[in-house]
Amino acid sequence: MASLRVERAGGPRLPRTRVGRPAALRLLLLLGAVLNPHEALAQPLPTTGTPGSEGGTVKNYETAVQFCWNHYKDQMDPIEKDWCDWAMISRPYSTLRDCLEHFAELFDLGFPNPLAERIIFETHQIHFANCSLVQPTFSDPPEDVLLAMIIAPICLIPFLITLVVWRSKDSEAQA
């Protein structure tokens, strides 16, 4: 049966990082980011005079984005107290993103684009600025449990040392 391992096929094996991904892939991604830096990953909107701007495409997209924003605000305003609860806001947030993406495709603009990014950032600043991850606070166990956890290994160590020494003397006597 043929093995699927790279070494058997004769190809070079890529060195792996701690997380298991090939180091060459990570270096390639890093090189791409360094050689081609962008302020944002968004695709730029066409300006007037470019082929994609005939008929005021960008202006129409801005109007459509305003519709998406107003619809999102109408959905979010009644939820006011639960803005940090993902179960409550996931639907309006997803609807906003889908709306922005739909109109970007409709007007032959890339997504994400600067206007869509600005809307997303704005909603984060308005609705989610005061949200933080709730992390449980850890406390020490009760004192009796803590003492048991400390004393048990301390008592076991001399017993285990005695057992090892005793067994090693037995093996020396047999040899």
Curated annotation (Swiss-Prot):
A GO CC annotation given for this chain: plasma membrane
Main location, first listed in the record: membrane
Residue spans, topological domain Extracellular: 43-143
Keyword Disulfide bond included in the entry's annotation: yes
Keywords annotated in UniProt: Cell membrane, Disulfide bond, Glycoprotein, Membrane, Receptor, Signal, Transmembrane, Transmembrane helix, Transport
Glycan attachment positions: 130
Cytoplasmic side: 166-175
Pfam families cross-referenced by the UniProt entry: RAMP (PF04901)
Coiled-coil blocks: none
Record membrane topology: Single-pass type I membrane protein
Signal peptide: 1-42
Site feature Required for CALCRL interaction, where: 139
Localisation: Cell membrane
Positions of disulphide bridges: 68-99, 84-131
Annotated GO MF terms: adrenomedullin binding; adrenomedullin receptor activity; coreceptor activity
Transmembrane regions: 144-165
Tissues expressing this chain: Strongly expressed in lung, breast, immune system and fetal tissues.
Any one Gene Ontology BP term: positive regulation of angiogenesis
Role description: Accessory protein that interacts with and modulates the function of G-protein coupled receptors including calcitonin gene-related peptide type 1 receptor (CALCRL) and calcitonin receptor (CALCR). Required for the transport of CALCRL to the plasma membrane. Together with CALCRL, form a receptor complex for adrenomedullin/ADM. Together with CALCR, act as a receptor complex for calcitonin/CT/CALC. Together with CALCR, also act as a receptor complex for amylin/IAPP.
Family note: Belongs to the RAMP family.
Family matches, as PANTHER family: RECEPTOR ACTIVITY MODIFYING PROTEIN RAMP, RECEPTOR ACTIVITY-MODIFYING PROTEIN 2
Quaternary structure note: Heterodimer of CALCRL and RAMP2; the interaction forms the receptor complex for adrenomedullin/ADM. Heterodimer of CALCR and RAMP2; interaction forms the AMYR2 receptor complex for calcitonin/CALC and amylin/IAPP.
Name of this chain's protein: Receptor activity-modifying protein 2
